[in-house]
Curated annotation (Swiss-Prot):
Annotated GO CC locations: chloroplast thylakoid membrane; NADH dehydrogenase complex
Protein's UniProt name: NAD(P)H-quinone oxidoreductase subunit 3, chloroplastic
Function: NDH shuttles electrons from NAD(P)H:plastoquinone, via FMN and iron-sulfur (Fe-S) centers, to quinones in the photosynthetic chain and possibly in a chloroplast respiratory chain. The immediate electron acceptor for the enzyme in this species is believed to be plastoquinone. Couples the redox reaction to proton translocation, and thus conserves the redox energy in a proton gradient.
Entry GO MF terms: NADH dehydrogenase (ubiquinone) activity; quinone binding
EC code: 7.1.1.-
Entries under InterPro entries matching the protein: NAD(P)H_OxRDtase_bac/plastid, NADH_UbQ/plastoQ_OxRdtase_su3, NDAH_ubi_oxred_su3_sf
Keywords: Chloroplast, Membrane, NAD, NADP, Plastid, Plastoquinone, Quinone, Thylakoid, Translocase, Transmembrane, Transmembrane helix, Transport
Catalysed reaction, written as an equation: a plastoquinone + NADH + (n+1) H(+)(in) = a plastoquinol + NAD(+) + n H(+)(out); a plastoquinone + NADPH + (n+1) H(+)(in) = a plastoquinol + NADP(+) + n H(+)(out)
Membrane topology: Multi-pass membrane protein
Domain of life (superkingdom): Eukaryota
Length: 120
Protein backbone atom coordinates (compact mmCIF):
# COMPACT_ATOMS: atom_id res chain seq x y z
CA UNK A 1 0.00 0.00 0.00
CA UNK A 2 1.33 3.39 -0.97
CA UNK A 3 1.18 6.20 1.53
CA UNK A 4 0.23 8.88 -0.97
CA UNK A 5 -2.49 10.26 1.26
CA UNK A 6 0.25 11.91 3.31
CA UNK A 7 0.86 14.26 0.38
CA UNK A 8 -2.74 15.48 0.15
CA UNK A 9 -1.99 18.58 2.22
CA UNK A 10 1.07 19.33 0.09
CA UNK A 11 -0.86 19.10 -3.19
CA UNK A 12 -3.69 21.17 -1.75
CA UNK A 13 -1.34 23.97 -0.71
CA UNK A 14 0.51 23.77 -4.03
CA UNK A 15 -2.68 24.13 -6.04
CA UNK A 16 -3.93 26.97 -3.84
CA UNK A 17 -0.58 28.78 -4.04
CA UNK A 18 -0.69 28.55 -7.84
CA UNK A 19 -4.34 29.60 -8.15
CA UNK A 20 -4.21 32.69 -5.90
CA UNK A 21 -1.69 34.66 -8.04
CA UNK A 22 -3.41 33.58 -11.26
CA UNK A 23 -6.77 34.76 -9.94
CA UNK A 24 -5.25 38.02 -8.68
CA UNK A 25 -3.78 38.79 -12.12
CA UNK A 26 -6.98 37.85 -13.90
CA UNK A 27 -9.17 39.98 -11.64
CA UNK A 28 -6.83 42.98 -11.86
CA UNK A 29 -6.67 42.61 -15.64
CA UNK A 30 -10.45 42.60 -15.88
CA UNK A 31 -11.18 45.40 -13.39
CA UNK A 32 -8.24 47.76 -14.02
CA UNK A 33 -8.79 50.64 -16.44
CA UNK A 34 -6.64 50.56 -19.55
CA UNK A 35 -5.32 54.02 -20.41
CA UNK A 36 -2.40 54.41 -22.76
CA UNK A 37 -0.57 57.64 -23.27
CA UNK A 38 2.87 59.22 -23.36
CA UNK A 39 3.09 59.38 -19.57
CA UNK A 40 2.47 55.64 -19.25
CA UNK A 41 5.24 54.89 -21.75
CA UNK A 42 7.90 57.07 -20.09
CA UNK A 43 10.30 55.65 -17.52
CA UNK A 44 9.73 56.58 -13.89
CA UNK A 45 12.63 57.95 -11.86
CA UNK A 46 11.20 58.75 -8.41
CA UNK A 47 9.06 61.64 -9.62
CA UNK A 48 11.92 63.38 -11.42
CA UNK A 49 11.92 63.96 -15.16
CA UNK A 50 14.04 61.25 -16.78
CA UNK A 51 17.40 62.46 -18.02
CA UNK A 52 18.97 60.55 -20.88
CA UNK A 53 18.42 56.91 -21.66
CA UNK A 54 16.84 54.77 -18.96
CA UNK A 55 18.77 51.65 -19.97
CA UNK A 56 22.21 51.14 -18.41
CA UNK A 57 24.62 48.29 -18.81
CA UNK A 58 25.85 46.95 -15.48
CA UNK A 59 29.48 46.08 -15.03
CA UNK A 60 30.41 42.40 -15.06
CA UNK A 61 31.64 42.65 -11.46
CA UNK A 62 28.06 42.79 -10.21
CA UNK A 63 27.27 39.55 -12.02
CA UNK A 64 30.30 37.82 -10.54
CA UNK A 65 29.26 38.73 -7.00
CA UNK A 66 25.70 37.63 -7.75
CA UNK A 67 26.97 34.32 -9.09
CA UNK A 68 29.08 33.68 -5.98
CA UNK A 69 26.09 34.57 -3.80
CA UNK A 70 23.86 32.12 -5.68
CA UNK A 71 26.43 29.33 -5.34
CA UNK A 72 26.65 29.73 -1.58
CA UNK A 73 22.90 30.18 -1.29
CA UNK A 74 22.36 26.85 -3.06
CA UNK A 75 24.96 25.32 -0.76
CA UNK A 76 22.90 26.44 2.22
CA UNK A 77 19.75 24.95 0.70
CA UNK A 78 21.49 21.60 0.29
CA UNK A 79 23.16 21.57 3.70
CA UNK A 80 20.14 22.61 5.79
CA UNK A 81 18.17 19.35 5.43
CA UNK A 82 21.33 17.39 6.11
CA UNK A 83 21.99 19.37 9.28
CA UNK A 84 18.42 18.84 10.49
CA UNK A 85 18.72 15.04 10.16
CA UNK A 86 22.38 14.67 11.07
CA UNK A 87 21.79 12.26 13.97
CA UNK A 88 19.79 9.85 11.78
CA UNK A 89 21.98 9.74 8.68
CA UNK A 90 25.29 8.65 10.14
CA UNK A 91 28.97 9.08 9.36
CA UNK A 92 28.89 8.25 5.63
CA UNK A 93 26.55 11.14 4.88
CA UNK A 94 28.74 13.40 7.03
CA UNK A 95 31.72 12.50 4.85
CA UNK A 96 29.69 13.20 1.69
CA UNK A 97 28.64 16.62 3.03
CA UNK A 98 32.25 17.34 3.98
CA UNK A 99 33.36 16.52 0.43
CA UNK A 100 30.61 18.80 -0.91
CA UNK A 101 31.79 21.69 1.27
CA UNK A 102 35.43 21.06 0.34
CA UNK A 103 34.57 21.21 -3.38
CA UNK A 104 32.88 24.57 -2.81
CA UNK A 105 35.85 25.84 -0.82
CA UNK A 106 38.23 24.80 -3.61
CA UNK A 107 36.00 26.57 -6.13
CA UNK A 108 35.89 29.77 -4.10
CA UNK A 109 39.68 29.74 -3.60
CA UNK A 110 40.09 29.27 -7.36
CA UNK A 111 37.75 32.20 -8.07
CA UNK A 112 39.61 34.32 -5.52
CA UNK A 113 43.01 33.52 -7.03
CA UNK A 114 41.77 34.25 -10.55
CA UNK A 115 40.65 37.70 -9.35
CA UNK A 116 36.93 37.15 -9.85
CA UNK A 117 36.15 38.54 -6.40
CA UNK A 118 38.23 41.71 -6.66
CA UNK A 119 36.40 44.96 -7.23
CA UNK A 120 39.10 47.12 -8.80
Amino acid sequence: MFLLYEYDIFWTFLIISILIPILAFLISGILAPIRKGPEKLSSYESGIEPMGDAWLQFQIRYYMFALVFVVFDVETVFLYPWAMSFDVLGVSVFIEALIFVLILIVGSVYAWRKGALEWS
